[in-house]
Amino acid sequence: MANDFLFTSESVSEGHPDKVADQISDAILDAIFTQDPRSRVAAETLTNTGLVVLAGEITTNAHVDYIQVARDTIKRIGYDNTEYGIDYKGCAVLVAYDKQSNDIAQGVDHASDDHLNTGAGDQGLMFGYACDETPELMPAPIYYAHRLVERQAQLRKDGRLPFLRPDAKSQVTMRYVDGKPHSIDTVVLSTQHSPDQSETATKMKASFTEAIIEEIIKPVLPKEWLQDTKYLINPTGRFVIGGPQGDCGLTGRKIIVDTYGGACPHGGGAFSGKDPTKVDRSAAYAARYVAKNIVAAGLARQCQIQVAYAIGVARPMNITVYTEGTGVIPDDQIAQLVQEHFDLRPKGIIQMLDLLRPIYAKTAAYGHFGREEPEFTWERTDKAAALRAAAGL
C-alpha cells in the first residue's frame, strides 16, 4: 500500500438489527454460563418486525428463560415502543434450539493429538491485529467509528438529543500521510430519528445536522484531525424506519465491524453466541492478545497474526506473524517467541484469557477489540515485558 492514501472503516450502533441479534445471542450465552460455564453454545438470532427467532445448538445443564433474556436485551437497547417496529413487551419470540452434535462433541472433548487437551470445535483460520495508531493499539478509522455510534447511544439514552432512536451507522475515512494517520477526510453518520426531528432540533436552537456534528462528532474525534473534514449526516434526508423493522437482523453479519474495520484479513467466523470452545471466537481473541502484546513490547509498529485449526485437534496448524516491515527483529523470530510465550491450544486459550465466564454480552456492540474493559482479558499487555526481554531489547 502507498504511504499516502485514504482508508475507511464503519461501525453500527447497538440498535442496528444485526447488532440486536448479536446482543441477544451473547446475552443467551451469558445467562447459560452464569449457571453452567461448561456448556456448549452456538446461539443464533434473527430479528424482524415484531419478531425474534432463537435457534442453534445448546448443550447445558442450565435452566434459562430464553424468551425473557431476549426481551430484556431488546428493552436495554431501547426498543420499548410499538412505533419502533419491535417492542420488548409485545414482540413474538420463537425458540428452536437443538443439542450440539455428538460427532462434534466427541472431537472437542478428546483431542486427537493429545487426550489431555480440548480439541478445536471446528476447522478454520483466525486473525489478530494491533498497531500504534491509537493508545488502544487499534486502527484509527474503526476505533473512532465505534466511538461515534457509542456516543449516539449515550446521548439518546440520557435525553440530551431526544429525537434520536436506536439504529445508527457511522463511517470514518482517514487520510494517511507517510503511512500514519494525518486527518479525517470524511465522516458519515446516519441516525434513526423521530418523525418530528426537525421541529425538535429547532427547539434546541440547532439544526439536526448541526446538533449531530456538535454533540456527537466533534466531542469524539481529535480536533487536530478535523481539517477540511466533510460531514455527511443522514445523506438520504430521512431515517425514521430503522432497526429490525427496516432490515432483518442476523447474528454474525457484522464481522468486520466486530474486528478491525478491514485493516487486516478476516477468517470468516463470527463471534457472538459462541462458547469459547469455538475457535472462531476464542482464537481470534487470543490472536488479538498476541498481536497487542507484540506491539506493546515495541517489537513492531503493527502486527498481524494468523492461526489455523483442524476440528478435534488441539494444536494450531500454523502461527504466522506479519509485521509489514515494521518489526525490529525478523517476523519468523517473533513467531518463535509467540510459540514460547503463548499457549494457543483451545484449552490453553480458555485458561490464559479466563473465558469460561459470563462476559460476552458487553462485547456484542462497539467492537470486541480496543476497549479497556476489565472483563476483556485479551486487551491486557501483561506479556509485553517478557517478550521484549526475550527479544533482547
Curated annotation (Swiss-Prot):
Homotetramer; dimer of dimers. Residues 100-110 are annotated as: Flexible loop. It comes from the Bacteria. Belongs to the AdoMet synthase family. One of its GO terms (cellular component) is cytoplasm. It holds the Pfam family S-AdoMet_synt_N. L-methionine binds at E57, Q100, D247, K278. Pathway: Amino-acid biosynthesis; S-adenosyl-L-methionine biosynthesis; S-adenosyl-L-methionine from L-methionine: step 1/1. Mg(2+) binds at D18. The gene is metK. This is S-adenosylmethionine synthase. InterPro entries: ADOMET_SYNTHASE_CS (IPR022631), S-AdoMet_synt_C (IPR022630), S-AdoMet_synt_central (IPR022629), S-AdoMet_synt_N (IPR022628), S-AdoMet_synthetase (IPR002133), S-AdoMet_synthetase_sfam (IPR022636). Catalyzes the formation of S-adenosylmethionine (AdoMet) from methionine and ATP. The overall synthetic reaction is composed of two sequential steps, AdoMet formation and the subsequent tripolyphosphate hydrolysis which occurs prior to release of AdoMet from the enzyme. It is found in: Cytoplasm. One of its GO terms (biological process) is one-carbon metabolic process. PANTHER family: S-ADENOSYLMETHIONINE SYNTHETASE (PTHR11964).
